[in-house]
Regions:
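N-terminal Rossmann-like NAD(P)+-binding subdomain of aldehyde/semialdehyde dehydrogenases
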Residues: 1-131
Length: 131
């Protein structure tokens, strides 16, 4: 098996991008067999991640109103939309056609935009929902 390039995939952990400590598992292009990257969670402190999510991420979201959260989702979708050509390029390495990928990429982004709009239209601009 020839290799076109090899990179270590990173994970977003406790506010920063980190690589696993070991070489990890190879991720191969299913069409060509070439190595795309390696991925490893060795050395990642999952207990610390859970605590970070509860004390930093969760608190941060709790401070946002529902409209602010909806706008954050919309802004992420807008950013990802600027990267859609790159996302199609990556998706092609899975063996998917552009049409296959369209459902996941543009369909997923459309869902994000839709949920954002629904939240802003149907929920009060508060930090909570009264049911």
């Amino acid at each position: 098996m020839s290799k076109s390039y090899k990179m270590k995939s990173k994970s977003y952990v406790c506010g920063e991008w980190v690589e696993g400590e070991l070489n990890g598992t190879q991720v191969n292009n299913p069409v060509t067999g070439k190595i795309i990257c390696t991925v490893s969670s060795a050395g990642v402190n999952f207990e610390k991640m859970t605590q970070y999510a509860r004390t930093v991420g969760g608190l941060g979201l709790g401070e946002m109103t529902l409209h602010e959260r909806a706008n954050a989702i919309k802004n992420i979708a807008k950013y990802l939309l600027t990267k859609k050509d790159h996302l199609y390029q990556i998706s092609s390495k899975t063996g998917a056609t552009k049409l296959d990928s369209w459902v996941d990429i543009e369909g997923g982004l459309a869902t994000m935009f839709s949920y954002s709009g629904i939240a802003r239209r149907e929920f009060a601009n508060e930090k909570f929902i009264v049911e």
